[in-house]
Amino acid sequence: MKYKMKKIIINLTIIIFTVITYSQSDVYSYSENGIINRIIIDNNYLVMTSYKVDSNKFIKTIGGFYNKVGNRFNMSLEFNSNFKNDSISKIEIEKKANWKNISLKKNDLQGKWLMVGRVRNGNEQRRNLNRPRKTMKFLINGYFQWIAFNTETFQFSGSGGGKYITENGKYIENIEYFSRDDSKVGLTLEFDYDVINREWNHKGFSSQGDPLHEIWVKRK
């Protein structure tokens, strides 16, 4: 009887630990041969990006939903910036001892967001979120990354990321990598933000200096 009780307690502990592990949102980093690898994770999605700090060169990014077994993330990719060369749509990533947790303070807007619309010249234009072409922003523990991609064709249209904070209605991001233009690395951009009816209204100027008003909705 005691043995069975111990076994039940151990099994419950394993289940509880697994649930806690799956519910974590963290940002990790490790370096290899001068290349920074950053991993942003929430309870069901993972994005890994590689870039060089010394030259500001973006190398690649992959991302998608995952199932976790032990220290291994089995991923079904939604995007792969190197897909034309390697055709990889599924991958297993192992969390290793050299992964350093670099998570910062959790800010407002934490989570995955899909762009659902824009406002141009006072006119609001909406997107169908079910279409394969998507623009997603992933905000976890003080870090952000946006990605434009097509889930059907694996066409990759661009990505950028870095650190962000939210304070007094301002969303402020510092760019640490940018696939389209390395010269934008180091820029700090400030936007007004407001969440209205669960939609994030994002207003300001783009990295090119153009006015923008984007509307984003949370992705599960």
Annotate the PLM regions.
Residues 1-27:
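Bacterial Sec-dependent N-terminal signal peptides
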Residues 20-159, 172-220:
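Lipid interaction determinants
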Residues 162:
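Phosphoinositide-binding peripheral membrane targeting modules
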